[in-house]
From Swiss-Prot:
Membrane topology term: Multi-pass membrane protein
GO CC annotation, single: plasma membrane-derived thylakoid membrane
Top-level EC class as recorded in UniProt: translocase
Signal peptide start-end: none
Cell location: Cellular thylakoid membrane
Organism: Prochlorococcus marinus (strain MIT 9303)
Organism domain of life: Bacteria
Subunit structure: NDH-1 can be composed of about 15 different subunits; different subcomplexes with different compositions have been identified which probably have different functions.
HAMAP family per record: NDH1_NuoA
Catalysis: reaction(s): a plastoquinone + NADH + (n+1) H(+)(in) = a plastoquinol + NAD(+) + n H(+)(out); a plastoquinone + NADPH + (n+1) H(+)(in) = a plastoquinol + NADP(+) + n H(+)(out)
Descriptive protein name: NAD(P)H-quinone oxidoreductase subunit 3
GO molecular function: NADH dehydrogenase (ubiquinone) activity; quinone binding
Matching InterPro entries: NAD(P)H_OxRDtase_bac/plastid, NADH_UbQ/plastoQ_OxRdtase_su3, NDAH_ubi_oxred_su3_sf
Length: 134
């Protein structure tokens, strides 16, 4: 019975073991432990006094002028949103472009559909005036 339990535990462990990934697992554990350790150390060693000067924002060594709550024009957000959309498009299309010669015609058609959808969205935003500053 002890032999069976040993065999079961060995097979159970080998089911989850990924040979060759020990270094990656070690790196993953260390890269997770270092920031956690830094945050805990900061929490334990940081001074706890909250005076008025300590609560001021740092503005290049100068006293802050005016309030920090100002309104930005909504156009900044529209340009940022369009930038993010096309930046994500680049992230999706780069791996496709790298493996283009191996993927074949179907992948090319899928990429064309993806680009067409984004161009329709760009044309819609342009037609609605989202890209005009006036």
């Amino acid at each position: 019975m002890a032999v069976n339990a040993r065999l079961i535990s060995k097979s159970y462990l080998s089911m989850f073991a990924l040979p060759g990934y020990d270094a990656f697992l070690g790196f993953l554990l260390v890269s997770a432990a270092v920031p956690i350790l830094a945050l805990v150390t900061n929490k334990l060693l940081a001074p706890r006094s909250r005076t008025g000067e300590r609560e001021l924002t740092y503005e290049s060594g100068m006293e802050p002028i005016g309030g920090a709550w100002i309104q930005f024009n909504i156009r900044y957000y529209m340009f940022a949103l369009v930038f993010v959309i096309f930046d994500v498009e680049t992230v999706f299309l780069y791996p496709w472009a790298v493996a283009f010669h191996r993927l074949g015609l179907l992948a090319f058609i899928e990429a064309l559909i993806f680009i067409a959808i984004l161009l329709v969205a760009l044309a819609y935003a342009w037609r609605k005036g989202a890209l005009e500053w006036s």
